[in-house]
C-alpha cells in the first residue's frame, strides 16, 4: 500500500499526476550498516536511505538519518516533504517524529496541504484521526482548500471518517463551505452514503438546504445514488439538533465529540439524532412544517389540534388555508368522537335506536381503522435495527406503551361483551313481554305484502295484454 501511495501524489478530484512514474521512492531490503552515519555517507546516499526508511516506516532509522544532517523539510519527487508522505500513509508515529523535529505542518504543494493529504489517506480511521490531531495541534489550517476548493472536512466526509469530521469542526473547520461544484461536506456524505457522517454534520450545524451548481440539495444527491435512508432523513425540514455543539468551547466540543463517539462505538448506536414527535410527523405529512414553532409556543399537542373548533383555529393564528388541510385530514382519519358524557341523563334515556345503532357502527369503524393502522406499522417496521433512519428512544418505553394498549384492548373487549349481553337481555325480555305493542313497521307488513301482490298481478295482466296484442297483429 505504501508503494501505491508513492506512485504519484494524490490530485484533488481523484486524478493522478501525469508526470513520470519514477517518483524517487523505492521499496526493497534496506541494508543498514552498523557504522555511524553522520559524516560517513554522501548526502545523496543519505537521502536514498531516508526515502527507503520512510517507505518501510522505520522510525528509528529516520531519526538516525535526521540526526546525521538530513533536513526534515527536504523535498523529493513532485516536491513532497517527508511529513506529507507520512500523512499520506497515515503513519501517526512518523508524523509525530517529523513534527517534533520541526517539520512544517502548513506546507502545501500545488494547493495540496498536508492536512488534506492526511484526511484523504488510505488507512484506519484511528490512525488518520491521530495524524489529523497532530497536524491541528501544530496550527494546520482546517479551512485551506485544494484546487477544486475542497477542504479537509469534505475529504473526511467523503471517506466516512466521523471522528475526523467532528475533530476538524472542533478546531474551526467551516461546515457549510462549498467546493467548485457546490458540494458541501454534507453533500459528499450523502453522495457516498455515509449515514453516520450525515447525522454528525446535522448535529454540528450543516445546512441541508444548500444546493450544488446544478441545483441539487443533499437529499436529492442521496436519492440519485440510491441511499434511501439518507434521503428520508434529509427530506425532513425539521432538524432539532442543528448546531447543538456550536455554542461550546473548543475544549468542551472535543471532549463531547470523543466521549460521545466512544460510547456509540461500544453501544452500537450510530447517532444521537432525536426522533420526531407525532405532531411534527403529522404536520410534515400535510406540508405544514411552518406551523410547528407556532403550535409548540402555544403548547398545542396533536390531540388538541385534532379536536379544535374553527374559532380555536383562528384564535391560535392558523390561517384558513391551513385549516382546510387539517380538516380534510381529520375527515379522512375519521377521528370524530361521540361524547355521551356531555349529554343530560334525560337525553341518555331518550336516545333513539337509530342514534344508538349509529354509535355502534362508528365505534366498529374506529376499531377497524385502528386495526389497519397497527397492521401497517407492523408491515413497515424494520426488522433490522440498522435500517432505522432516525434514532429511537429505549425499546423499553415502546414495550411498556404496548402493554398498556393490550390492557386497554382487553378492557374494551370486556365492556363490549357486557354491552352485547345487556342488549341480548333486553331483546329477550321484549319478546317475552305480553304487553309489548307491535311496532308500526311490523303492523304494516301485511299491507306491504298486499301491495306487492297487487303490483305483481297488474304486471302479469299487462304482460298478458301485450302477448294478445302481438298475436293479433301477426294474424
UniProtKB/Swiss-Prot annotation:
One of its GO terms (cellular component) is pi-body. Its main location: cytoplasm. It comes from the Eukaryota. SUPFAM superfamilies: Ankyrin repeat, Pseudo ankyrin repeat-like, SAM/Pointed domain. It is found in: Cytoplasm. Residues 1-24 are annotated as: Disordered. The modification Phosphoserine is found at residues 17-18, 20. CDD domains: SAM_ASZ1. Signal peptide: none annotated. Residues 272-334 form the SAM domain. ANK repeats lie at residues 45-74, 78-107, 110-144, 148-177, 181-210, 214-243. InterPro entries: Ankyrin_rpt, Ankyrin_rpt-contain_sf, Asz1_SAM, SAM, SAM/pointed_sf. Keywords: ANK repeat, Cytoplasm, Developmental protein, Differentiation, Meiosis, Phosphoprotein, Repeat, RNA-mediated gene silencing, Spermatogenesis. One of its GO terms (biological process) is male meiotic nuclear division. Interacts with DDX4, PIWIL1, RANBP9 and TDRD1. Plays a central role during spermatogenesis by repressing transposable elements and preventing their mobilization, which is essential for the germline integrity. Acts via the piRNA metabolic process, which mediates the repression of transposable elements during meiosis by forming complexes composed of piRNAs and Piwi proteins and governs the methylation and subsequent repression of transposons. Its association with pi-bodies suggests a participation in the primary piRNAs metabolic process. This is Ankyrin repeat, SAM and basic leucine zipper domain-containing protein 1. The lineage of its organism: Eukaryota, Metazoa, Chordata, Craniata, Vertebrata.
Amino acid at each position: 500500500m505504501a508503494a501505491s501511495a508513492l506512485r504519484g501524489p494524490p490530485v484533488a478530484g481523484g486524478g493522478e499526476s501525469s508526470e513520470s512514474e519514477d517518483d524517487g521512492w523505492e521499496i526493497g531490503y534496506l541494508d543498514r550498516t552498523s557504522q555511524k552515519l553522520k559524516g560517513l555517507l554522501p548526502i545523496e546516499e543519505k537521502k536514498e536511505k531516508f526515502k527507503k526508511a520512510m517507505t518501510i516506516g522505520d522510525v528509528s532509522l529516520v531519526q538516525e538519518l535526521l540526526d546525521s544532517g538530513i533536513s526534515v523539510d527536504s523535498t523529493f519527487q513532485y516536491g513532497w516533504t517527508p511529513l506529507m508522505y507520512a500523512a499520506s500513509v497515515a503513519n501517526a508515529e512518523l508524523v509525530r517524529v517529523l513534527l517534533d523535529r520541526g517539520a512544517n505542518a502548513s506546507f502545501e504543494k500545488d494547493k495540496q496541504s498536508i492536512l488534506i493529504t492526511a484526511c484523504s489517506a488510505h488507512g484506519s480511521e484511528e490512525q488518520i484521526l491521530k495524524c489529523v490531531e497532530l497536524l491541528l495541534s501544530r496550527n494546520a489550517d482546517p479551512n485551506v482548500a485544494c484546487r477544486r476548493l475542497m477542504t479537509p472536512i469534505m475529504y473526511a466526509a467523503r471517506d466516512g471518517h466521523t471522528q475526523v469530521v467532528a475533530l476538524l469542526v472542533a478546531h474551526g473547520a467551516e461546515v457549510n463551505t462549498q467546493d467548485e461544484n457546490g458540494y458541501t461536506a454534507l453533500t459528499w456524505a450523502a453522495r457516498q452514503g455515509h449515514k453516520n457522517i450525515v447525522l454528525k454534520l446535522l448535529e454540528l450545524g450543516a445546512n441541508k438546504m444548500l444546493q450544488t451548481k446544478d441545483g441539487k440539495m443533499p437529499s436529492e444527491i442521496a436519492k440519485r445514488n440510491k441511499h434511501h435512508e439518507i434521503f428520508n432523513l434529509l427530506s425532513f425540514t425539521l432538524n432539532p439538533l442543528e448546531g447543538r455543539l456550536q455554542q461550546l468551547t473548543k475544549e468542551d466540543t472535543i471532549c463531547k465529540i470523543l466521549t460521545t463517539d466512544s460510547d456509540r462505538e461500544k453501544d452500537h448506536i450510530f447517532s444521537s439524532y432525536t426522533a420526531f414527535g407525532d405532531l411534527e410527523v403529522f404536520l410534515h405529512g400535510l406540508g405544514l412544517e411552518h406551523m410547528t414553532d407556532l403550535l409548540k409556543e402555544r403548547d398545542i399537542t396533536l390531540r388538541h389540534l385534532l379536536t379544535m373548533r374553527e374559532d380555536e383555529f383562528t384564535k391560535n393564528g392558523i390561517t384558513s388555508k391551513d385549516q382546510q388541510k387539517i380538516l380534510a385530514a381529520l375527515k379522512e382519519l375519521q377521528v370524530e368522537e361521540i361524547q355521551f358524557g356531555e349529554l343530560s341523563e334525560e337525553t341518555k334515556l331518550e336516545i333513539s335506536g337509530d342514534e344508538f345503532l349509529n354509535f355502534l357502527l362508528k365505534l366498529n369503524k374506529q376499531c377497524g381503522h385502528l386495526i389497519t393502522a397497527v397492521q401497517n406499522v407492523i408491515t413497515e417496521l424494520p426488522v433490522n435495527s440498522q435500517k432505522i433512519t432516525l434514532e429511537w428512544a429505549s425499546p423499553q418505553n415502546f414495550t411498556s406503551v404496548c402493554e398498556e394498549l393490550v390492557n386497554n384492548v382487553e378492557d374494551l373487549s370486556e365492556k363490549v361483551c357486557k354491552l352485547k349481553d345487556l342488549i341480548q337481555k333486553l331483546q329477550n325480555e321484549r319478546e317475552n313481554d305480553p304487553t309489548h305493542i307491535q311496532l308500526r313497521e311490523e303492523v304494516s307488513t301485511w299491507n306491504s305484502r298486499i301491495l306487492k301482490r297487487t303490483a305483481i298481478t297488474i304486471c302479469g295482466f299487462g304482460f298478458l295484454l301485450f302477448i294478445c296484442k302481438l298475436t293479433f297483429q301477426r294474424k
